């Protein structure tokens, strides 16, 4: 394989991994530990 192909595959894989981790953090099990400032502010 050429160097450009390997670089493109590694960058794409890193981007997909980061996106998956961000979605898991936002909506998965760790999301229950996040605080919601709008719920804390009572009107």
Curated annotation (Swiss-Prot):
Keywords: Chloroplast, Membrane, Plastid, Thylakoid, Transmembrane, Transmembrane helix. The chain crosses the membrane at residues 5-27. InterPro entries: PSII_PsbN. It holds the Pfam family PsbN. One of its GO terms (biological process) is photosynthesis. GO terms for cellular component: chloroplast thylakoid membrane. It comes from the Eukaryota. It is found in: Plastid, Chloroplast thylakoid membrane. It is a single-pass membrane protein. May play a role in photosystem I and II biogenesis. HAMAP family: PSII_PsbN. Belongs to the PsbN family. This is Protein PsbN. It comes from Lactoris fernandeziana. The lineage of its organism: Eukaryota, Viridiplantae, Streptophyta, Embryophyta, Tracheophyta.
């Amino acid at each position: 394989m050429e160097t450009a192909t390997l670089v493109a595959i590694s960058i794409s894989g890193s981007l997909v991994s980061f996106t998956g981790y961000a979605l898991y953090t936002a909506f998965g099990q760790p999301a229950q530990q996040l605080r919601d400032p709008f719920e804390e502010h009572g009107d």
